[in-house]
Design a protein with these regions (language model features):
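Conserved NAD(P)H cofactor-binding loop of Rossmann-fold oxidoreductase domains
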Residues: 64-69, 209
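Substrate-binding pocket helix/loop in short-chain dehydrogenase/reductase
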Residues: 71-84, 169
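Residue(s) in the substrate-gating loop at a strand-loop-helix junction
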Residues: 113
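C-terminal helical subdomain
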Residues: 152, 168-199, 206-208
């Protein structure tokens, strides 16, 4: 998996380990199976080679690494492309590198974002990367049909510190709470299980209903400050 050193990725890794899985995580931060920059082709190749040399096969690939978030006003050409390399190119290339080694019943789960369908100002690099990985999901599902199931998850507001919010922060969510990493980890485990054997090419939004909630200025206490 990618991006397993902290946050959602760390929780996913821990939950797989509880199920007896051997987790090979790559992250820029130290303390994981492989430390390196996902934007570099040679890093991806070295990571894949290490995994295959040591274990010989891959059951699940979880693409979770966080792309850079910068907007049109301050994001450089290099930074924008860096975000795409981490968020889209790396997931594609790892799937390509591991393609000959996926086990029977293997699954890929890509972590996208609810920002793949909605936006805030000055978030272009992140939003485009997340939109890209959502599209990559259904493309890979068709290309790898019959061998590997491929799905994606689009989290909404997930507090990676497991903070329990109250008041407006919680109530604005239709489920009346902010999400936590277990909400995502549980779905990843399900999508990798035989229970999800008839699901591929899908994107599942886990956002407490926020993207389904219509918001208008002056309605239900909402206001837009100009």
């Amino acid at each position: 998996m990618t991006g397993g050193a902290q946050g959602i990725g760390k929780t996913i890794a821990e939950e797989f380990q509880k199920q007896g899985a051997i987790v090979c995580s790559i992250d820029k931060q130290p303390g994981v199976y492989f430390t390196g920059d996902l934007a570099q082709q040679d890093t991806l190749e070295k990571f894949a080679q290490k995994v295959i040399t040591e274990y010989g096969h891959v059951d699940y690939l979880i693409n979770n690494a966080l792309p850079l978030m910068k907007g049109i006003d301050n994001c450089s050409y290099e930074e924008f492309n860096y975000a795409l390399k981490v968020g889209v190119t790396a997931p594609f290339y790892l799937a390509k590198l591991f393609q000959p080694y996926f086990s029977e019943g293997a699954a890929i789960v890509n972590i996208s974002s609810s920002r793949d369908r909605m936006s805030q100002p000055q978030t272009e690099s992140y939003t485009v990367a997340k939109g890209g990985i959502s599209a990559l999901t259904h493309a890979l599902a068709v290309s790898l049909a019959g061998r590997v199931r491929v799905n994606s998850i689009s989290p909404g507001w997930i507090d990676t510190d497991f903070t329990e919010y109250t008041g407006a922060d919680a109530v604005q969510q239709p489920v009346h709470r902010v999400g936590n990493p277990m909400d995502i980890a549980n779905m990843v485990l399900f999508l990798c299980s035989e229970k999800a054997g008839f699901i591929t090419g899908e994107n599942i939004c886990i956002d407490g209903g926020m993207t389904k909630q219509m918001i208008y200025h002056g309605d239900c206490g909402w206001r837009f400050d100009i």
